[in-house]
């Protein structure tokens, strides 16, 4: 475990108390971050985020999952909230703490934090597959093409696809769904790791493209799938209400955002708040050994709302520029 000397710790605490941190920022200043998408060619979506020296790479892979018919509607609805499967792996080269078995606990903790962030009902409800925007000429051609394909498929069986319907990620309602495996790799760490992870995951989901699938029911009720090989014939994800995390760390009597690795070594307590673009709170998790009084918690949450919306606006602007 990394350590910091008493003199270094005192220097950082006094700087935070005087609103002048060791890197020149004030208590609520966020470091600049960079986003790159489409980094992993064979993934359905990917993104790389660099927050100072903290660097995270996320890839998204889509697979068809069969839901057993005997599952009740309540269990099925609950299972729908698990259409996203998260896995985090911290590279040993990113930090001495990640060497050997040092990263095992952190990998599990970060993965579960992402699961909690995305388990909010409003996140799953609004994270839908949407149709791509097609020009009028192409749309007419596609309608002709689909009509011709439909006549051919009538001879083989009934087309029962409902991709992109109101049931999140559904291919055949109640039977087959898309499951998205979101795998993250921590390439380097200089503090505020989970915030960087949440930014990278949201960016990767925005970059995700899922091929259109037709589910065809045969004569004996068996279902086969026809996956479009047209790279333009895809579905994308609506991420408008997908949150990111803002972590607020208490050092001494004050709290700061976007901590460096050295600042984290001086931490008394922290609060990680999931915020979406509407400034709604999607998750809250406390860490650290010290307690937090209600007044401080309210101040932290209000700060997280303001900072979170600001970061999301920057993200959406950056992702729009990348897409264009």
Swiss-Prot record:
Described function: Non-catalytic component of the RNA exosome complex which has 3'->5' exoribonuclease activity and participates in a multitude of cellular RNA processing and degradation events.
Task: Extract one GO cellular component term from the record.
Answer: nucleolus
Q: Quaternary structure?
A: Component of the RNA exosome complex.
Can you say where in the cell this protein is located?
A: Nucleus, Nucleolus; Cytoplasm; Nucleus
CDD domains with a match to the protein in the record: RNase_PH_RRP42
User: Which InterPro entries does the record associate with it?
Assistant: ExoRNase_PH_dom1, ExoRNase_PH_dom2, ExoRNase_PH_dom2_sf, Exosome_comp_Rrp42_subfam, PNPase/RNase_PH_dom_sf, Ribosomal_Su5_D2-typ_SF
The record's Gene Ontology biological-process terms are: exonucleolytic trimming to generate mature 3'-end of 5.8S rRNA from tricistronic rRNA transcript (SSU-rRNA, 5.8S rRNA, LSU-rRNA); nuclear mRNA surveillance; nuclear polyadenylation-dependent rRNA catabolic process; rRNA catabolic process; TRAMP-dependent tRNA surveillance pathway; U1 snRNA 3'-end processing; U4 snRNA 3'-end processing; U5 snRNA 3'-end processing
Is Zinc included in the keywords of this UniProt record?
no
What family name appears in the similarity comment?
Belongs to the RNase PH family.
Q: Which GO terms describe its molecular function?
A: mRNA 3'-UTR AU-rich region binding
* Source species: Dictyostelium discoideum
Kindly provide the name given to this protein in its UniProt entry: Putative exosome complex exonuclease RRP42
Alphabetical keyword list: Cytoplasm, Exosome, Nucleus, RNA-binding, rRNA processing
**Keyword Nucleus listed:** yes
Q: Which domain of life is it from?
A: Eukaryota
> Where in the sequence is the signal peptide annotated?
none
